[in-house]
Amino acid sequence: MRHYETMFILKPTLVEEEIKSKIEFYREVITKHHGVIETSLDMGMRNLAYEIKKHKRGYYYVAYFKADPSMILELERLYRINEDVLRFIVIKYESKKEVEAWHALVDRANKKPSHAKEKHEKTEHTHSHHAEEAKSTESHSE
C-alpha cells in the first residue's frame, strides 16, 4: 500500500448534515477499497483564495491514508461527478523522504511530536546543557 493525502473543498451552501454525509461517503470509499485512514483534519469553513463557481468560501477536509494505487482512480472519479465538490487534490508520497514527511504530517495532525523534531530537541538540550556547564566552570574558576 502507498501513502496518500487528499483534500477536498465542499460548497458552502451545504448544511451540516450534508457536509457530514459527504465526508463519511469519501471516508467509506477509501475503507471499502481496503484503504486505511491514518488521520484526518476537518478544517471547516474557510475563505477561498479566489472565487470558484461563484463561491468565496468553502468547507475544507483533509485525510491522510494508505491505499492501493488502483483505488485512487475511483476516488478521483467520485470527486469529479459530485457537484458539491468545488476542488480536490490527491497527493502520492513515493520516496523514502516523502513517506517520512507524510508520517510527520500525520503526527502533527494527531498532535504528536514528530520523530525528527524529537531528535532535534534532544540535540538542542544537550548543547544548551554543555553551554551551562561551561558557564558554571568559568564562574568557579574566577
UniProtKB/Swiss-Prot annotation:
Family: Belongs to the bacterial ribosomal protein bS6 family.
Protein name: Small ribosomal subunit protein bS6
InterPro entries with a match to the protein in the record: Ribosomal_bS6, Ribosomal_bS6_CS, Ribosomal_bS6_sf, Ribosomal_S6_plastid/chlpt, Transl_elong_EF1B/ribsomal_bS6
Region of interest called Disordered, as start-end residue ranges on this chain: 110-142
One annotated Gene Ontology cellular component of this protein: cytosolic small ribosomal subunit
Residues that span the membrane, as ranges: none
NCBIfam families linked to this entry: S6
Organism: Helicobacter pylori (strain J99 / ATCC 700824) (Campylobacter pylori J99)
GO terms of biological process kind: translation
